[in-house]
């Protein structure tokens, strides 16, 4: 399969900061036949696709709620541009349901204004499929080492761009 013939999936992501400057990290549920199959580094930020005619910021808030139950947030910043990653060649045709070469993502830094009891991942609200099986607050600079290798450059860029909000 030639990756050049496949599009990037339009997505958003959220770096959720608590009042102490730590970021929310979720451990992806183990799934077969996805880009996370048999990956030891499954920790990531909430992210997901942009629906047709949906504004990216609205998509980010929706994805955050669907995956974590969190809605008590304030906007800190939006990434300067779109960040992309490519799936490894062996995952083409498998990861991202086989329809995309990778993702083109707009990222948002948000401040969590609620209580931790608001965070619900097992199960998430409104009957959504669980994306994560664990979560914790960590330092932003730790995240590039906790994510799957092919997403590391995106997380390194986020760690640099959103550093002013971090502990």
Spans of features found by a protein language model:
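N-terminal strand-loop-strand
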Residues: 1-45
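Hydrophobic (often cysteine-bearing) scaffold residues that line and stabilize catalytic clefts
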Residues: 8, 56, 151, 155
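Residue-level marker of positions within ordered structural domains that often coincide
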Residues: 19, 113, 160
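Short, glycine/charged-enriched secondary-structure capping and boundary segments
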Residues: 30-31, 39-40, 90, 123, ...
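Short amphipathic alpha-helical patches
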Residues: 31, 87-91, 159, 166-167
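Unchanged
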Residues: 48-149
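Charged phosphate-binding loop/patch that engages nucleotide di/tri-phosphates or the phosphate backbone
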Residues: 140-167
């Amino acid at each position: 399969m030639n990756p050049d013939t496949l599009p990037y999936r339009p997505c958003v992501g959220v770096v959720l900061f608590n009042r102490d400057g730590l970021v929310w990290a979720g451990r992806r549920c183990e799934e077969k036949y996805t880009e996370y199959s048999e990956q030891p580094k499954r920790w990531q930020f909430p992210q997901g696709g942009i629906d047709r005619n949906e504004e990216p910021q609205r998509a980010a808030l929706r994805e955050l709620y669907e995956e974590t139950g969190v809605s008590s947030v304030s906007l800190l910043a939006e990434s300067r541009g779109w960040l992309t990653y490519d799936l490894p060649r062996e995952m083409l045709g498998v990861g991202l349901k086989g329809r995309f070469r990778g993702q083109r993502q707009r990222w948002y830094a948000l401040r969590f204004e609620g209580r931790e009891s608001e965070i619900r991942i097992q199960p998430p609200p409104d009957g959504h499929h669980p994306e994560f099986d664990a979560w914790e607050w960590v330092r932003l600079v730790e995240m590039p080492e906790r994510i799957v290798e092919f997403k590391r450059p995106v997380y390194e860029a986020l760690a640099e761009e959103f550093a002013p909000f971090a502990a």
